[in-house]
Amino acid sequence: RTDETGYTTRVGLEGAYANYLLGTKGRRLEQKIAKGQWKLASGFDIIEPKDGYDVVSTININIQDIAHHALLTQLKKYKAQHGCVIVMEVSTGEIKAISNLELNKKTDTYTERYNFAIGEAHEPGSVFKLMTVVAAMETRNIDTTYVVDIKDGKQQYYDKTFQDSQHHFTGRISLNKAFSVSSNVGMTELVHSLFAKNPSDFTTQLLSMNLNQQLGLPILGEGEPFIPTPRDKLWSGVTLESMSIGYAVKITPLQSLAFYNAIANGGVMVKPRMIKEVKEWNKTIEKFNVEIINGKVCSKQTADKAKGMLADVVRRSYGSGHRLYSPDFSMAGKTGTARKNYANADASKLSYISSFAGFFPVDNPKYSCIVVIHEPDRSVGIYGADVSGPVFKSIAHKIYTNSLLMDTVEDVENVSEKTTKNYEDYYAKAAKYKTVMPDLTGMNVMDA
């Protein structure tokens, strides 16, 4: 990246770890002699150049390839403006894949030009509902059976009307169902009933979960998250309700994923990491270990309840992510569909952000993943489950099918004596007779 003064800063890992990669320049004094030749002028003032170290990244090239092409497929299908995907290992925070693609309108192709996953803070929409229910459970001692009234799918606070995009239920339903169907009215009713008199209780809990803080990545350009508080000048009578469904707040995809990963990790938030170690040939110079950002974004009990709610989004027939369900492997996550320019009075010019965040498998999660796609063509589709969800499912499915599965075979008590003797005879012969491979050096394939 070149600034206005002409100074060039490398982006990505090269820029973040330049102090390891660059090495040091050498120096020696030489004298020009006849015929344009040079000779060493002095043997005392010599500084030998030193190669830079090798940086070992956490990226898994197989998962990276899967994630990149899954994202590219959906971007093309929905004619989207740009998108990103991140896959992270739950227990360690190691980034296994990260892809950022943007449409080049001149060539009508998708290329990597900007790191949206790390740098783009935006209103996340419904994926933020996880943060809302976790904050509610932590501060008001409620659980998934707490009842909210979603009425007929519409609710007005002051001059703003909140409504559900899809109507599965009406009236009083459990918080778990409201979350599963991604009810906007259910979430606004939840925070209004619990926090309307003391909204600072809600925002304070969000702040305690590190949602207003950058992750402190070594890579330049991390986006700045924003969580409003009642003390802010722009706080209004509907800010609390707007926050509950992922508006009036800003957060980057990686910051969102760090929170989802914390829920999968029992409430422990680990720092996303892209480097394993620094090496010089086979010698380890520095090793990067797991770093805990927040040892308790919520209690393990709350995390377990939240995991169950995220699982129901996919496995329940009425869940907003049920179309992603597979009987072959388990997934948990949350759909998101956010309006980008909702202040525009012309509804025909609205654009959307489609997202899906979650983890897999449900029991003992191994990987967390987030997919965010901006401005899909409205005529093709806009909903998170349709646009971004298939990227998540494709990644989870291919990782699952490519994983080495080892089955434990129990010892058999009644073993045939004849079979046992046959095996003993075979191993005895194998140990006695040695096979010699002929020397085929220098021979072509046909002769060999």
Q: Residue locations for each model-derived region?
A:
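Beta-lactamase-like hydrolase cores
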Residues: 62-89, 208-211
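Beta-lactam-recognizing serine transpeptidase/beta-lactamase-like catalytic domain environment
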Residues: 32-46, 50, 59, 85-125, ...
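C-terminal, active-site-flanking charged/polar segments
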Residues: 363, 374-377, 385-402, 406-409
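N-terminal leader/targeting segments and the immediately adjacent pre-domain N-terminus
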Residues: 45-76, 414
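Serine endopeptidase catalytic core focused on the charge-relay Asp
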Residues: 11, 15, 61-74, 185, ...
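Conserved catalytic/cofactor-binding microenvironments
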Residues: 404-422
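Small/polar-residue-rich segments within soluble enzyme cores
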Residues: 1-50, 371, 390
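Glycine-rich loop/hinge motif
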Residues: 416, 421-448
